[in-house]
Curated annotation (Swiss-Prot):
It is found in: Cell membrane. Homohexamer. The lineage of its organism: Bacteria, Pseudomonadati, Pseudomonadota, Gammaproteobacteria, Vibrionales. InterPro entries: UbiD, UbiD-like_C, UbiD-like_N, UbiD_Rift_dom. SUPFAM superfamilies: FMN-binding split barrel, UbiD C-terminal domain-like. This is 3-octaprenyl-4-hydroxybenzoate carboxy-lyase. The keyword Cell membrane applies.
Length: 617
């Protein structure tokens, strides 16, 4: 199953009941976000808004709003088949020569796929049916979405940004958010380690002061779009990978104003340049973390040409607290990552990036442990092997018998097999996502590795295993009494698999230092009943019994080193870790804390009024 362009993909989804056309007039300012968010959270279809208020261009959202649609876009029938995509990428990253004639025959299907890799260059293409240039260039004619009430400006989200470094043979495709600031100008927000930013850096070194050519394509075929978000080897272009997924060469055409090649079937293409000396303040925007980010200086992209197909479709999305479309993509791409990691670390049984952890800030790994210290080697491997995991703050490693995708199973392993202080690896001053406001410094923070594997004798030398102790039953009456003694406590959850040695507590936090004081009180309380090892403190907006809420709070509101309390063990009791996943007061941190995204009640009520008319679900 493959699709030559976005329109063919739309037709297929519509035939299968996976896309809904919305004929009711809908405003790109906020309304589309609210409708798309409701639809995605309900596992609903892709949406094609045919009558955006004030515009003649339809808007496509929620295209990859379920893992199944991501798999279909990659030419697969089922999400599980994405493991085969990962195996192919692992092979291309480190190809093995055939061991003989029989092995060569077995590898023949792979070689045939590789033949589809080079892009096919066209002289004319649908994406250049209509051309705007000079004063005709006008972003106000395109229904760019405004997503959240406190966003600074409309935001372009799904553009495939095409760049080429001066010393590179191939182009780079990347997806970066872009703030609209004028009819012909947007701010290009790309992080320093991303391909586009690296190409610009190299360009400025070899062509100081000269404009850097850039093209941005919206609405390419699904294989090309997904190729831009997949961890392809550095030696393989995204166009080539898209050809592998599709089973046919990716058709491209040279941009009108520069030498960059863009997808021939793209709906809309923006061409222009970045002046190395032109910057602007980007943000704040509500982001995939569920918070508004800080302002940052980024380069400005000046658009000199806009080309498009006849009757173009504008492809867009929104980002917000998981689940959103990036989180769904993360769930699907997780299956691609597993074989790539297993090629380098065959001992890995499973690898899971929970979407509630913003799809990259936490990883759970299960493995076949073969020697002392093996779990820590795997932690280091996760952090260093793929660029995608550079910003993963927490890595939990468990034995192969543990279900990495079941939090009750994971915390059971943590309480049974960890001495928390001994088996926790903390690394300071490591690269961190600049959107992570919990880090002490922009772009720099700590990482935590938790070894929840069964320990070998050598690993017990510094801290012998504490013999299992019987736990007294903690009754609801006991917990109610605790709440009366500490009225700031909202709820207490003791996961049933942890024998009362793991607690999640939500609280009403009123002042700095309050969470640390409560943590100490809780350990004294639990000591009456059990050898408690872990306490996680969260704010009252978190449901203590919902792992989605808990993991989201841990990954967005903690710097692991600063916000973890360590208590050394005693002869008769284990060491302890306290994780403070509460929002921090100004005196507790060194930079501005994030503001959570909140929906506008008036907007919600307005969409409520038309929801049934839309007939989406």
């Amino acid at each position: 199953m493959s699709f030559k362009d976005l329109r063919e993909f739309i037709d297929h989804l519509e035939q299968k009941g996976r896309l809904k056309r919305i004929t009711h007039p809908v405003d790109p300012a906020y309304e589309m976000t609210e409708i798309s968010d409701r639809t995605l959270r309900a596992g609903g279809p892709a949406l094609l808004f045919e009558n955006p208020i004030g515009y003649n261009v339809p808007v496509l959202t929620n295209l990859f709003g379920t893992p199944e649609r991501v798999a279909i876009g990659m030419g697969r029938e089922d999400v599980k088949e994405l493991r085969e995509v990962g195996k192919l990428l692992a092979y291309l990253k480190e190809p093995e020569p055939p061991k003989g004639f029989k092995d060569a025959l077995e590898k023949l299907p792979v070689f045939k796929q590789v033949l589809n890799m080079p892009a096919k260059r066209l002289r004319k293409a649908p994406c250049q049916d209509i051309v705007w240039q000079g004063d005709e260039v006008d972003l106000d004619k395109i229904p760019v979405m405004s997503c959240w009430a406190e966003d600074v400006a409309p935001l372009l989200t799904w553009g495939l940004t095409v760049t080429k470094g001066p010393n590179k043979k191939r182009q780079n495709l990347g997806i970066y958010r872009q703030q609209k600031i004028a009819k012909n100008k947007i701010i290009m927000r790309w992080l320093a380690h991303r391909g586009g930013a690296l190409d610009l850096r190299d360009w400025m070194e070899t062509n100081p002061g000269k404009p850097f050519p850039v093209s941005v394509a919206f609405g390419a075929d699904p294989a090309t779009i997904l190729g831009a978000v997949t961890p392809v080897p550095d030696t393989l272009s995204e166009y080539a990978f898209a050809g592998l997924l599709r089973g046919s060469k990716t058709e491209v055409v040279k941009s009108i104003s520069n030498d960059l090649e863009v997808p021939a079937s793209a709906e809309i293409v923006m061409e222009g340049y970045i002046d190395p000396n032109e910057f602007a303040d980007e943000g704040p925007y509500g982001d995939h973390t569920g918070y508004y980010n800080e302002k940052e200086k980024h380069h400005v992209f000046t658009i000199t040409h806009i080309t498009m197909r006849k009757d173009p479709i504008y492809h867009s999305t929104y980002t917000g607290r998981p689940p959103d479309e990036p989180a769904v993509l993360g769930v699907a791409l997780n299956e691609v990552f597993v074989p790539i990691l297993q090629k380098q670390f065959p001992e890995i049984e499973d690898f899971y990036l929970p979407p509630e952890g913003c799809s990259y800030r936490m990883a759970v790994v299960t493995m076949k442990k073969q020697y002392p210290g093996h779990a820590k080697r795997v932690m280091m491997g996760v952090w260093s092997f793929l660029r995608q995991f550079m910003y993963t703050k927490f890595v939990i490693v468990c034995d192969e018998s543990v279900n990495a995708r079941d939090w009750n199973d994971v915390v059971k392993a943590m309480t049974e097999h960890m001495d928390p202080v001994r088996d926790t690896l903390m690394i300071d001053n490591t690269p961190i996502d600049s959107l992570d406001f919990a880090s002490p410094v922009v772009g720099l923070g700590s990482k935590m590795g938790l070894d929840a594997t069964i320990k070998w004798d050598a690993e017990l030398a510094t801290r012998p295993q504490i013999s299992k102790q019987d736990s007294k039953v903690i009754t609801e009456a006991d917990l109610e009494s605790l709440k009366q003694q500490r009225p700031e406590i909202i709820d207490i959850y003791l996961p049933p698999t942890t024998n009362n040695r793991f607690a999640v507590v939500t609280m009403k936090k009123d002042q700095a230092g309050q969470s640390q004081a409560l943590m100490e009180y809780l350990w004294d309380f639990f000591a009456q009943y059990t050898d408690n090892k872990f306490v996680i403190l969260c704010d009252e907006d978190v449901n203590a019994r919902d792992w989605n809420d808990i993991i989201w709070a841990v990954t967005t509101r903690m710097d692991p080193d600063r916000d973890t309390t360590r208590v050394s063990g005693k002869a008769e009791s284990s060491s302890k870790l306290g994780l403070d996943a509460t929002n921090k007061f100004e005196s507790e941190v060194t930079r501005e804390w994030g503001t959570p995204i909140k929906k506008d009640p008036k907007l919600v009520a307005k969409v409520d009024e038309i929801w049934d008319q839309l007939g989406i679900l």
